[in-house]
Amino acid sequence: MMKLSVSFLLLLMLLPFITGEENSDSDVLKSGAAVRQGRGRCRGFREDCSQHRDCCGDLCCNGNTCVITVIACPKW
C-alpha cells in the first residue's frame, strides 16, 4: 500500500512536466494550488483573461475569456 501511495504522489508531481504545462520552480512548490506567481489566482471558466497562461489548467484564453477547447491552446 505504501508503494502505491508513493507512486501516486510521484505521478502527481511529474504530471505537469509530462503534459508540457509551463511552471516556474516556485509554482511547482505550491503543491498544485491554483496560484500564479506575481499575478494572483488563475482565472476559471468564463472569467476575463489576456493570455492563455492567465487561465487555470487546460482552459484557453479566447476573446479575453477563459474557455474550454477541443484542442490544446497555441503556445503564443
From Swiss-Prot:
UniProt tissue specificity: Expressed by the venom duct.
Function recorded in the entry: Antimicrobial peptide that potently inhibits growth of Mycobacterium tuberculosis (H37Rv strain) (MIC=3 uM).
The entry's keywords: Antibiotic, Antimicrobial, Disulfide bond, Secreted, Signal
Name of this protein: Conopeptide X11.1
Principal location: secreted
Keyword Signal: yes
Protein location: Secreted
Transmembrane residue ranges: none
Record's keyword annotation contains Cytoplasm: no
Native source species: Conasprella ximenes
Signal sequence coordinates: 1-20
Single Gene Ontology BP annotation: defense response to bacterium
Propeptide stretch(es), residue numbers: 21-39
InterPro entries registered for this protein in UniProt: Conotoxin-I_CS
